[in-house]
């Protein structure tokens, strides 16, 4: 499964059209869209701020689980010194970019569901729009709780898909199925977290992202950068993807 994920994302995340849409920022997530948000990069930065607001005292160390190309890690440097920040990912190609985006941070090739850290290693953990890929969320949550220090906080955003969508994805994805925010909260508690605050941000993140993405594609078509067939195919693909996201939880879980 990891090889399949890398094959897709190592191509998509370096595609010229995708990079243009994300403002060459190296973010690749839905972002948080408020009234007045104009660009995807701005929305991605707003999502980071929304998640980090769950951590009022930004102290100690923080782990960026599934850090992608390091844009999320770079944003953490607004609040943490580089030596306090660790990023992990399963793609060495993306980690090479991450090291350039967030110099001084520690980056390690590592599976988020099999953390190779000692117990109580971090004060905080963040994971942005990645846990639906993990094998599985439950394993990741248990591992996250293990490596957090007492009183530590896990913050994340995630996509909860329909059962139909999970069935057509790679084998094993149904083992990672979570029905709704209530089920997510129960999963956090069973992993060892004492409580979990959850906001369902499907409208603010996934739905508004889709509108912005299609608007961008139409603009590129009018400019002659892509043809109408490409516009139709990409718009249909993105619409199907978002239509099958039932919930987009923002989660803050705290270890006792």
What are these regions (language model features)?
Residues 138-153:
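A short glycine-rich, Lys/Arg-flanked "PGG" loop and its adjoining helix->strand segment in the class I
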Residues 113-125:
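A short acidic, Gly/Pro-enriched loop at the edge of an enzyme's catalytic core
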Residues 200-256:
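Conserved Class I S-adenosyl-L-methionine
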Residues 41-58:
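Conserved alpha-helix/loop element of class I SAM-dependent methyltransferases that forms part
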Residues 1-32:
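N-terminal, positively charged/glycine-rich alpha-helical extensions of SAM-dependent methyltransferases
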Residues 63-65, 69-114:
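Class I SAM-dependent methyltransferase SAM/SAH-binding core
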Residues 156-176:
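Short, glycine-/aromatic-enriched active-site segment of Class I SAM-dependent methyltransferases
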Residues 176-192:
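Short alpha-helix
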